[in-house]
Structures are given as structure tokens and as C-alpha cells.
């Protein structure tokens, strides 16, 4: 670390000591949510850090009011637990107070929530072309190379796929440090990701540091330019347009702000996804509001680029819109949700995904976890040919894997009915609407040889 960086860090610490963050947790003023107020000295990226803390605790942010103009950061969040109730767990409340309050150091401890601790494991980051059977193929390669997958998250969007996997050696249960072995793992996985006829580059990165999985997946897909529109030959492109988020960008010239508004279906971690992307694109949120009404979410941000300027051109405007749309859609869980809970064993992920592939199912998103010798995996699957999933197919898969081990969270008939039902729009209401006058507000095929 350079002398100038040391001086910057000491200056930041001095500012925090002079202006310590203040956190107020209120369970009385709102009937349906816990209200969390955060006041602190303002610094770049602090909004994302706070939202990341709350999101990683599996809290749902139903409303938010953001103000960080000048040197002070003042935010209010209405949050609920996973069941839609106020947060009453004293352990969680104490953690919020310590993580966001005077004891917190935003540059270090706050990032420990939701982070993969990789001291005794190896983290593999993968980016490549999505296709039927990809997850099955990747996990088969890792099993062949005597690697166990402890935790993993896989996203697919717009013909691209990204994964962050935490692996260990089968025999030792520890991370893999042999350079030659790591090089072989990287090369074989890269060959799988390349496929046979894709011009796009495939990337594999191996590390031993701590990784915040969701943060990295957004960064990886952003760097891979998954937001760029691609031609699709089937009817999925029509359905994709129907589900497209409504994102608008307008300049408020009097105040040199760009006003970004987002309207889309509400879901967990939505605020994190949009704020994460704005931060990665180097935009600073000065004011904003977030509101949910029924199944819809409304977000409004008053932003400038980190250089102090609003959006400068039509091309930049379209890029902001495309990137926010991609950030929202990456985590949209398309397909049938399957949950697997069983005793963990070597090759489990490879075997399960092989069964999916053999039954013509493709994994659109997956979350793999191991805890206390148990495998807790969630898969979102769809028919590789684009048809509705036959209930008989699911029954057959469950019989093969185990009826009590693999459970269906939403059946194909219910899924199809929801897709056919029209969405009901609600009027947008924003906190700063009266104060600021703006103009408007895959597919996964088994390659037999991976070497």
C-alpha cells in the first residue's frame, strides 16, 4: 500500500471518529415494518454497503428514502423479515446496530456479511456461453478432478452464464494450492465454457480471498456485457419483452442531476441489484426513494457520474437503461423451483444435474450450499426445448433422486397460469416527486471431451 493510500485511510478514520455513524432502529412508528435510520459522514459507495448489509441478512426493504447531498449521508429504510413481519430477533437487531453504527468500519467489517470465507477453500469464477447441460458438464469436470463443491451460485442471462464456486480437495477437505493442479482445473473448465461454436470469450479465475458472491456475479456479467441485446430465434424474446422492466433516464438540467426511474415486479434483493449496478457504472446517488405497492416496485434516483456530471449523451442514457434492465433480470427466477436437501457426498451436484439433463431440463439459476454435512440446493429449471415442463417428468426425476430429498416449490400448471395472467399496474408514487420537478419520471449439453 502506498503512502498516499495510508494517508487517505487515516483521514477516513479521522472523519469517522469526528462524525461517528448513528443508527436508530424503530419498531413503533410503523405498523408493518421496522424502520432503520442511518446517519453518517458521506463517502462513495456507502449506500451500497448499507443496502448490502440489510440484504445479506435476508431482510426485505419495502420503502427507502435516500439523501446524501453534500458531506452527510441520511437514509431511512423500512424493512421486514422473510415472512413479511417486523424484525424482532435481538441477535439480528444487535448485528445491524454494530454493523452500521459507530463500531463499524465500512471498508472492512461491513463486507464480511454474506461473504464466502475462503481460507480453507478455493474460489473459482466462471463466465461463458449458456447452453443446455452446462452446469451438469461443469460439475462433472470438477468431480473428475477430485474437487468438492461446498457453495456455488450460478446465474444465466441473455445467452451468457456466470458462476462463483467454492471448492475443496476431496481428500483433504481444504483449498487447492498446487499451481499445476489449479492451472489444469482452469484450462478444463475454460474448454467447457467455450463450447464448440461460440465466438465469445470464456473466463476462469481462481482465488483464495474473500468473495461476496452476489456482488461478484453482477460485476462478472457486467464485464461480460450481458446487457447487450442479442438476436433470439424463438418465442422467448417475445415473452422477454413482456417481462422487461420499465427504466427511464431524464436530465434535470437546472440541478445537473440525471433522474433514473425504475418500475418492475417486486422481488427480494431488487434494491441491492440496482444500487450495485449504478455503483459499478460509477454513478453516485444523491437523492432517491423506493416504494413497493402490491407486487410492483418503484425506484427513483437522482444521480451524477463520479466526475460530477449528469448523463451526457443518448448513447450513455441507453447504456444505463440496458445495464439496469440486465441487473434486474439476472436474478429473475425463470422456471420451476426445485429444492434438494440431503446428506452431502462426493459427486452429488454432478449426479443431480446429470439427471436434469437426461430429462431435457436446463438450469436457469442455481444456489448450492453445504452446512453441517447437509446439502441445501435450490435449482430453477425449464424445458430445454422451450415447452412447458410435464408433471410426469418431474415425478420421474423425484423418483430417481428421492421423493423426500427433492421437493417442488411451484408446479408447472401454476407457473403457466401466472405467466398468462395480465399484470396490474399501480400509480407511481415517489418521495421527492413534489420537491424535485423532473421532466418524467439456457441453457445448460454434455461435451464428451473437456481436454
From Swiss-Prot:
Residues 410-420 have a biased composition (Polar residues). Keywords: Repeat. One of its GO terms (cellular component) is plasmodesma. Highly expressed in flowers and at lower levels in leaves and siliques. Pfam families: ACT, ACT_6, ACT_ACR9_3rd. InterPro entries: ACR1-12 (IPR040217), ACT-like_dom_sf (IPR045865), ACT_dom (IPR002912). Residues 409-428 are annotated as: Disordered. PROSITE patterns: ACT. Induction: By the cytokinin benzyladenine (BA) and cold stress. Residues 35-118, 123-200, 259-335, 337-416 form the ACT domain. It comes from the Eukaryota. May bind amino acids. PANTHER family: ACT DOMAIN-CONTAINING PROTEIN ACR4, ACT DOMAIN-CONTAINING PROTEIN ACR4-RELATED. This is ACT domain-containing protein ACR4. It comes from Arabidopsis thaliana. The lineage of its organism: Eukaryota, Viridiplantae, Streptophyta, Embryophyta, Tracheophyta. The gene is ACR4.
Amino acid at each position: 500500500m502506498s503512502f498516499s493510500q495510508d494517508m487517505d485511510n487515516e483521514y477516513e478514520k479521522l472523519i469517522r471518529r469526528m462524525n461517528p455513524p448513528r443508527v436508530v432502529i424503530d419498531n413503533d412508528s410503523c405498523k408493518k415494518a421496522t424502520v432503520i435510520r442511518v446517519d453518517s459522514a458521506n463517502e462513495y459507495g456507502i449506500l451500497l454497503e448499507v443496502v448490502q448489509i440489510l440484504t445479506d441478512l435476508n431482510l426485505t426493504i419495502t420503502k427507502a428514502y435516500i439523501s446524501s447531498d453534500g458531506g452527510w449521508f441520511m437514509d431511512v429504510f423500512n424493512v421486514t423479515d422473510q415472512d413479511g413481519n417486523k424484525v424482532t430477533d435481538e441477535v439480528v437487531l444487535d448485528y445491524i446496530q454494530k454493523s452500521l453504527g459507530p463500531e463499524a468500519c465500512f471498508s472492512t467489517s461491513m463486507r464480511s456479511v454474506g461473504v464466502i470465507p475462503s481460507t480453507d477453500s478455493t474460489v473459482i469464477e466462471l463466465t461463458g456461453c449458456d447452453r443446455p447441460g452446462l452446469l451438469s458438464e461443469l460439475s462433472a469436470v470438477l468431480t473428475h478432478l477430485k474437487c468438492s463443491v461446498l457453495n456455488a451460485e450460478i446465474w444465466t442471462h441473455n445467452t451468457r452464464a456466470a458462476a462463483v464456486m467454492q471448492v475443496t480437495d476431496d481428500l483433504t477437505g481444504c483449498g487447492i494450492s498446487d499451481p499445476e493442479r489449479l492451472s489444469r482445473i482452469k484450462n478444463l473448465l475454460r474448454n467447457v465454457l467455450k463450447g464448440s461454436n461460440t465466438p465469445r470469450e470464456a473466463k476462469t479465475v481462481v482465488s483464495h480471498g474473500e468473495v461476496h458472491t452476489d456482488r461478484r456475479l453482477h460485476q462478472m456479467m457486467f464485464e461480460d456485457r450481458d446487457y447487450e441485446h442479442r438476436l433470439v430465434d424463438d418465442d422467448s424474446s417475445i415473452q422477454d419483452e413482456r417481462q422487461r422492466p420499465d427504466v427511464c433516464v431524464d436530465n434535470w438540467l437546472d440541478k445537473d442531476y440525471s433522474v433514473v426511474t425504475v418500475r418492475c415486479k417486486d422481488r427480494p434483493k431488487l434494491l441491492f441489484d440496482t444500487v450495485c449496478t449504478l455503483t459499478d457504472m460509477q454513478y453516485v446517488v444523491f437523492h432517491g426513494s423506493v416504494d413497493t405497492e402490491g407486487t410492483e416496485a418503484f425506484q427513483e434516483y437522482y444521480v451524477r457520474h463520479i466526475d460530477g456530471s449528469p448523463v451526457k449523451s443518448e448513447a450513455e442514457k441507453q447504456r444505463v437503461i440496458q445495464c439496469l434492465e440486465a441487473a434486474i433480470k439476472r436474478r429473475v427466477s425463470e422456471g420451476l423451483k426445485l429444492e434438494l436437501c440431503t446428506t452431502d457426498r462426493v459427486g452429488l451436484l454432478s449426479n443431480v444435474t446429470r439427471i436434469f439433463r437426461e430429462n431435457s431440463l436446463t438450469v436457469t439459476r442455481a444456489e448450492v450450499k453445504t452446512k453441517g454435512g447437509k446439502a441445501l440446493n435450490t435449482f430453477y429449471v425449464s424445458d430445454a426445448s422451450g415447452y412447458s415442463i410435464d408433471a410426469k417428468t418431474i415425478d420421474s426425476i423425484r423418483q430417481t433422486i428421492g421423493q423426500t430429498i427433492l421437493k417442488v416449490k411451484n408446479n408447472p400448471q401454476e407457473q403457466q397460469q401466472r405467466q398468462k395472467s395480465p399484470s396490474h399496474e399501480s400509480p407511481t408514487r415517489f418521495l421527492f416527486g413534489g420537491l424535485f420537478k423532473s421532466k418524467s419520471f439456457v441453457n445448460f449439453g454434455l461435451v464428451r471431451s473437456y481436454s
